[in-house]
Amino acid sequence: MIFVTGDCHGNFERFKPKYFPEQAQMTKRDIVICAGDFGGVWFGDGRDEAALDWLESLPFTLAFVCGNHENYDALERYPVKDWHGGKVHRIRSHVLHLMRGQVFELEGYHFFTMGGAKSHDTEDGILEPGTPDFERKLLMLQRKPRARYRINHISWWAQEMPSEEEYAEARKNLAKVDWAVDYVITHCAPTNIALMENRHNEADPLTDFLQEVKERAHYHYWLFGHYHDNRAIDEKHILLWEQIVQVI
C-alpha cells in the first residue's frame, strides 16, 4: 500500500491510529509520502529526536519530499542512500527524505519526486544573523502586527529552491524512463496551476520547471501540497493538506 498526504509542519497527529486506522493492516513495506513541509527535521538538534523516534515506531515507512519550510542545513547532514532506484536522505531506517529529481520504483510503479517551493511569507524581509542591525530589525518586526519575515538558517533556507544540478538530475532521470512515470510528487504546483490557486502566487524557476514536466511527461496522477487545501484540481492533479489518500 502507498498513501500520500500534504504538509505536516512538524505536526504528526494525523498519523495516530485513531485518525489513520488503515495502519493496522500496514507493515514497513507500506509507505506514506508527505508532499513537502514535513517539518520533522526543523531544529537540527535533539529537539527533533522524540518526534522522529515516534515516526520510526509506526508500522509503515514514512517518506517525504522537501517543502519550503525545512531545515536544509540539517537535512543535508544525513547520509545519502540508494532506495528503490533513487536517492534518499535516511533520517531513520524507515523515515526517508525523497531527494529532488529522483525516479523511484515502488510496488511496480514509477514515482518522480521534486520537492521545494519559493516562500511567500517574507514580505517584511529575510534577516541575516550576525549583521550589525540584526537585533534592531528583529525587535522592530516582533513589534509589528502580523509581520511576515524569516531568519536565514533559522527559519528560512536558500535551498528551498532547487539548484541547477538538481534540475539537471531531474531531466536526466526522467530521460532514463522516456519521461513516462505513474505518479509525480511535488510540494508546489506547475505554473499554470499555481497561478490559478491564488492571485498572489507568482511564477518562479521551480514552477516553470514543473510546467515543463507537466507538458512533456506522461503520468497518471500528480499530487502536491503547499497551498493548504484538499481538493482535486482536475482528474490528474490532486492538492493535499491534512487528508491521507491511498494511491496504490
How does the language model describe each region?
Residues H9-R14, G39-G44, N68-E76, V103-F104, ...:
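Active-site environment of divalent metal-dependent phosphoester hydrolases
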Residues A50-D53, N173-A175, A180-G225:
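Cap/insert and terminal regions of metallo-dependent hydrolase folds
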Residues S93, E107-H200:
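Active-site-proximal loop/helix segment associated with metal-binding centers of metalloenzymes
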Residues M1-F3, Q102-T113, Y183, D234-I238:
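Beta-strand-turn-beta hairpins that frame and shape the catalytic cleft
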Residues I2-V4, I33-C34, V184, L223:
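Residue-level marker for buried hydrophobic side chains located in beta-strands
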Residues E105, D208-R216, Y227-I248:
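Binuclear metal-dependent phosphoesterase catalytic core
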Residues T5, N11-L106, R199, A203-Q211, ...:
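Core catalytic region of metal-dependent phosphoesterases/phosphodiesterases
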Residues M1-V4, C8-R14, F134, A147:
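Acidic, histidine-bearing metal-coordination/catalytic regions of metal-dependent phosphoesterases
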